[in-house]
Amino acid sequence: MGSISPGTGIGHVHLKVADLDRALAFYQGVLGFELTQRFGRSAAFLSAGGYHHHIGLNTWESLGGSPPAAGTTGLYHTAIVYPSRAALAVALRRVLAAKIPLEGAADHGVSESIYLRDPDDNGVELYCDKPKEKWPRAADGELAMYTRRLDLHELLREAPEGTEMESGPRDL
């Protein structure tokens, strides 16, 4: 079996949502994605910049629907990568200001992550990678990822001066 081309990447995720306006309030209003195209009340494309869309939202088969029951197969989470720890801190401030509950926060050795749910109960991971030269490795050179508590107070100190926040981090 052949290998995938090293230039291959994931272009976008397309989510079924129950309420397009509510989903846009989260992805555009809270997380800051740019609306690139909207198709009436049934679909929208959002971008982190420089691309036609990174997230698609639609109600074609899900208008007014409920999230899948726990214990079923499907998408675990969408991971949104930020270019720096400071950018992740700003995203965390926006999430906290919107009073969106956090499900967890972790240092994985290779990255630092914050976990939450969107309004349709889809898992969302907000993260930033650590520099590759700092990734933990075993004696044989293999990655040695781990999961440790991420200090949210320390992370929030990385946000640039003047970044507003209406509430502080919750203890996890």
Regions found by a protein language model. Give the residues of each.
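Short beta-strand/turn micro-motifs at beta-sheet edges
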Residues: 1-2, 63-68
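Short loop/turn motifs at secondary-structure junctions
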Residues: 9, 32, 74, 101-102
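Core segments of cupin and vicinal oxygen chelate
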Residues: 5, 15-61
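Residues in well-ordered beta-strands of folded domains
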Residues: 47, 58, 79, 117, ...
